[in-house]
């Protein structure tokens, strides 16, 4: 069986280092897909915590080629504001695309911008802007329900921008989620574990099944359980075209490696 530890793997660079270029390319492709879905000129409003991952992924010239005219950092709107006039956005384009994590502060900010636009335009008049949101790494049901509750779900286009591991160096990968520890240990929110499991599954699709998983602590154990469950679901589920996730010869269609689910175990 060929796995991430196979020195003869075609996805390994010289000197035994793993070639992480596919991860960078995957992130760039996901971002390009979102930008291309809005062909018109667009303004980006960006969650400041995404500055690091985005800077590692794209440059200004590439953004301009895909119709990005202006970029601004998102600023959190105070929940106590009684008027929406002060939260109107002044974008130079009709298309506005938010890039943010699915956090309450940002969906409230987006709602405040939408309400200000609606009030300024009048209930029966077209809005000045068209709103799209790319949630990193993916939308949550809470986001969808929030927009539905406030009557703007149909007016806001939502995408999932699956940015997972950022390539910091040839041997350093990071999820670049500075609030993960606070969510896990203070808020009791295990969403970061779910996102981490998805990211680790992506690694397995590229390089093959992890032959060994080692962790320490309750949260590491929960992450491992999530990863094992997702791997089993992946192996047991057919894709959208009806093709088996595992070929008849027992290899993974993503990696070409021999699949043996029993190799995925915890120590």
Where are these regions (language model features)?
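Extended, well-folded catalytic/binding cores that form a central cleft or groove in large enzyme
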Residues: 1-267
């Amino acid at each position: 069986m060929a796995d991430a530890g196979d020195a003869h793997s075609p996805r390994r660079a010289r000197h035994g280092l793993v070639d992480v270029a596919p991860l960078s390319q995957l992130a760039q492709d996901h971002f390009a897909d979102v930008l291309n879905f809005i062909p018109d000129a667009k303004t980006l409003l960006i969650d400041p915590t995404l500055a690091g991952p985005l800077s590692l992924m794209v440059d200004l010239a590439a953004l301009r080629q895909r119709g990005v005219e202006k970029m601004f950092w998102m600023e959190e709107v105070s929940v106590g504001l009684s008027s929406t006039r002060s939260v109107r956005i002044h974008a130079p384009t009709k298309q506005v695309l938010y890039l943010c994590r699915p956090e309450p502060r940002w969906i409230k900010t987006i709602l405040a911008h939408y309400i200000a636009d609606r009030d300024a335009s009048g209930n029966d008049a077209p809005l000045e802007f068209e709103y799209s949101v790319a949630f990193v790494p993916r939308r949550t049901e809470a986001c969808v329900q929030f927009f539905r509750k406030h009557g703007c779900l149909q007016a806001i286009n939502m995408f999932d921008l699956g940015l997972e591991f950022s390539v910091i160096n040839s041997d350093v990968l990071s999820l670049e989620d500075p609030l993960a520890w606070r969510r896990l240990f203070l808020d009791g929110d295990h969403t970061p574990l779910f996102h981490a499991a998805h990211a680790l599954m992506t690694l397995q699709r590229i390089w093959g099944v992890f032959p060994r998983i080692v962790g320490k602590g309750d949260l590491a154990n929960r992450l491992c359980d999530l990863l094992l469950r997702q791997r089993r679901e992946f192996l047991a589920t057919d894709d959208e075209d009806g093709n088996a996730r595992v070929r008849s010869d027992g290899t993974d269609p993503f990696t070409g490696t021999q699949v043996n689910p029993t190799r995925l175990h915890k120590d």
